[in-house]
Curated annotation (Swiss-Prot):
Keywords: Endoplasmic reticulum, Heme, Iron, Membrane, Metal-binding, Microsome, Monooxygenase, Oxidoreductase. This is Cytochrome P450 1A5. InterPro entries: Cyt_P450, Cyt_P450_CS, Cyt_P450_E_grp-I, Cyt_P450_E_grp-I_CYP1, Cyt_P450_sf. One of its GO terms (biological process) is xenobiotic metabolic process. PANTHER family: CYTOCHROME P450 1A, STEROID 17-ALPHA-HYDROXYLASE/17,20 LYASE. Its EC number is 1.14.14.1. GO terms for cellular component: endoplasmic reticulum membrane; intracellular membrane-bounded organelle. GO terms for molecular function: arachidonate epoxygenase activity; heme binding; iron ion binding; monooxygenase activity; oxidoreductase activity, acting on paired donors, with incorporation or reduction of molecular oxygen, reduced flavin or flavoprotein as one donor, and incorporation of one atom of oxygen; oxygen binding.
Amino acid sequence: MGPEEVMVQASSPGLISATEVLVAAATFCLLLLLTQTRRQHAPKGLRSPPGPRGLPMLGSVLELRKDPHLVLTRLSRKYGDVMEVTIGSRPVVVLSGLETIKQALVRQAEDFMGRPDLYSFRHITDGQSLTFSTDTGEMWKARRKLAQNALKNFSIAASPTASSSCLLEEHVSTEASYLVTKFLQLMEEKQSFDPYRYMVVSVANVICAICFGKRYDHDDQELLSVVNVVDEFVDVTAAGNPADFIPLLRYLPSRNMDSFLDFNKRFMKLLQTAVEEHYQTFDKNNIRDVTDSLIEQCVEKKAEANGATQIPNEKIINLVNDIFGAGFDTVTTALSWSLMYLVTYPHMQKKIQAELDQTIGRERRPRLSDRGMLPYTEAFILEMFRHSSFMPFTIPHSTTRDTVLNGYYIPKDRCVFINQWQVNHDEKLWKDPQAFNPERFLNAEGTEVNKVDAEKVMTFGLGKRRCIGENIGKWEVFLFLSTLLQQLEFSIQDGKKADMTPIYGLSMKHKRCEHFQVKKRFSMKSSN
C-alpha cells in the first residue's frame, strides 16, 4: 500500500467515524463502570438517601445548570430532606429542612464538619485556607478560634474617639459619613447613580482598617486593586467550576479556571505585601490590628508546649485571607439588597426612619448599643437576609466518617450541600414566604424581635464551620444601614424600576441599578 493510499484511507470519514464511536463507547462503558463501582451501598438494615437517577457521567448536571437552589428545593419536596444527586461523577447529599440541617451540623457536628476535596479548593491559599481546607483536626480548630478571637477583639476594642464605643463603630461611621457626602455629590452631578460601586469600597475599607490598621482614600489604587480582584473572584466562582465534579475537565483549557487561579495568585500577593510590612514594623507593645495580633501569636507562642496554637509565619497570610473574606462580600451584598428593598417598599423606609428619629434623634449617630431599641430596623434586616437568601448554599461540607442521618446511611467523604434558600422559604416555617414582610419577626406590639424566629434564618451556616465573620457582618450591616437612613432618603428615578431578579452565583446579586436618587433629611448637628 503506497503512502497516498494510506493517507486517503486514514482520512476516510467512515473509518474515523467508526474508530471514534468505538473509543467513545469504550470510554462510556469504563466511566459508567467506575461510577457504579464508586457508589457505596448502605450496610444491612440501612438505606441510602433517595434521589433522581441522572444521566451516566453527567448525573443531574444539566438540570442544575440554572438556579440549582430552586431545582434542589423542588426535588426535596419529592425525595425529602435528605436526598442524593449525582453531579458529574460525584455523588452529593443535599440537606433541606431546618431540623435536619441542625441535626447534621449541630448535633452531629463532628460527622459533617469536613470540606470536600474539590479541585478549586486546592488553589485557594494553596489549600491552606481555614474556610476551604479539608483539615478538621485540633490544629485547625485552634487556629480557627485564634482567627475568630482576633477579628472580634479588634472590632469591639475601645475607640479612641468619644463619638464611637468601639473600633468597628468608628470605622463604619467614617465610611458611612463618606457615603452620605458622596451620594449627595453624585446627585448634584448626575441626578442619579449606582450606589454599589461606592459601598463596596467603603466595606473594603472597614475590613482593611480591622486587618491592617489602615484607611485608604477611595481613589487609592492599592485599595481599588483589592476590590477589583475580589469582584473578579465572585464573578469567576459564580459560574462554578465543572472540574470539581467532572475530573476529565481539569485537563482541558478553561477560561474560568485560568481566571480563578490568576485571582488567587494576585490576591495572595496583595496580602503578602501587607503582612510583610507588618512584620517589619511589628512592636509587641503596640498591637495595632488583626495582623499584628496574629504575628504576636506567632512570635510569643513558639516557646509554648501546645503546638496547636502556634502559627507558622506563612500561615498568617492564610488566616488574614480568611478574615478578609469573612467581612467583605457578604456585607456588601447585604447592603446592596437592603437598598433595593428600601426603594421598592418606601413605606418601610419611612418606618425605619421614624424609629431612628424617635430612638436616636438627630444629635448623634447610631451605635451598636441601639440595636435592641430599634426592633423594626432589626426586623427589616432579618427579612432582607431571609427573603433574598443571597447565600443560597453554604460552602459545601463533607462527612468525616460513615454516619447515619434521619435513618439514611451516608459514607465518609461524601460531599454535602446545605440548601439555605429552602429553609428561608419553607412554608412549614414561614407564613407566605414569598412576601417581603419584616413584621413577621416582631411581637404583637411591634416592640421586640422574636428571637426564636430570628434564629430560623440561615445565611452564615451552622455548627463548627459557621462563618467566623457572622456577628461582625451583622453589626456592620446594622451600622451602615441605620447611619445612611438616618441622614438620607433613598428613591428611584421616576419611570424607572429596581430589578430584584437574583443572579445566581457564590452569592446572589441583583442587576446593577443606576437609577438611585437620594435626598438629605437633615444636617447632622453634632457627631457626639
